[in-house]
Amino acid sequence: MANAGLQLLGFILASLGWIGSIVSTALPQWKIYSYAGDNIVTAQAIYEGLWMSCVSQSTGQIQCKVFDSLLNLNSTLQATRALMVIGILLGLIAIFVSTIGMKCMRCLEDDEVQKMWMAVIGGIIFVISGLATLVATAWYGNRIVQEFYDPMTPVNARYEFGQALFTGWAAASLCLLGGALLSCSCPRKTTSYPTPRPYPKPTPSSGKDYV
């Protein structure tokens, strides 16, 4: 039987990772303007996310522009969007499935093996969700690095990693760790031995058998 405390810990970690994926997807700070070179503008901060680009003035005023055209976006941004949304949807499914398999829940109490398998399946879905988030954030981060060191990119058009990217990496790690802990609920196979057959006891011989 799996440890109920370890199972609950995995569920909490994976759920926190799922929430972190939602926060990372919604935040606009996936990449922030790099203050490198001679043309440094400290009066404003420029950052960009999956859905919009924003400019924050030193006065506290923030102006954001939503990406209107889907076809006008680069392939990296479109793929990152898709992977993050897929990861969030998979995480939602994993929460429902693993909740049924939790020992603290009363669902499927009559069949403990099936209940444990539900927790295992939920953990596997959490792992897949974490991998989708990890691939999305790593792909986007790699694009930022390539553009930063590209000599053809102007100095005033270079960006660095934003807070949302770090949030996505942390969320992916939590989903992977929590999903792995839930997957440890896999029921072990028990070796069954055949039931020994009772043999009749030999009857003691009596003197009547001899003449």
UniProtKB/Swiss-Prot annotation:
One of its GO terms (molecular function) is virus receptor activity. It is found in: Cell junction, Tight junction; Cell membrane; Basolateral cell membrane. GO terms for cellular component: apical plasma membrane; basolateral plasma membrane; bicellular tight junction; cell junction; cell-cell junction; lateral plasma membrane; plasma membrane; protein-containing complex. The keyword Membrane applies. Residues 210-211 are annotated as: Interactions with TJP1, TJP2, TJP3 and PATJ. Residues 190-211 are annotated as: Disordered. It is a multi-pass membrane protein. It comes from the Eukaryota. One of its GO terms (biological process) is establishment of endothelial intestinal barrier. Disulfide bonds join C54-C64. Claudins function as major constituents of the tight junction complexes that regulate the permeability of epithelia. While some claudin family members play essential roles in the formation of impermeable barriers, others mediate the permeability to ions and small molecules. Often, several claudin family members are coexpressed and interact with each other, and this determines the overall permeability. CLDN1 is required to prevent the paracellular diffusion of small molecules through tight junctions in the epidermis and is required for the normal barrier function of the skin. Belongs to the claudin family. Can form homo- and heteropolymers with other CLDN. Homopolymers interact with CLDN3, but not CLDN2, homopolymers. Directly interacts with TJP1/ZO-1, TJP2/ZO-2 and TJP3/ZO-3. Interacts with MPDZ and PATJ. Interacts with OCLN, CD81, CLDN4, CLDN6 and CLDN9. This is Claudin-1. It comes from Rattus norvegicus (Rat). The lineage of its organism: Eukaryota, Metazoa, Chordata, Craniata, Vertebrata.
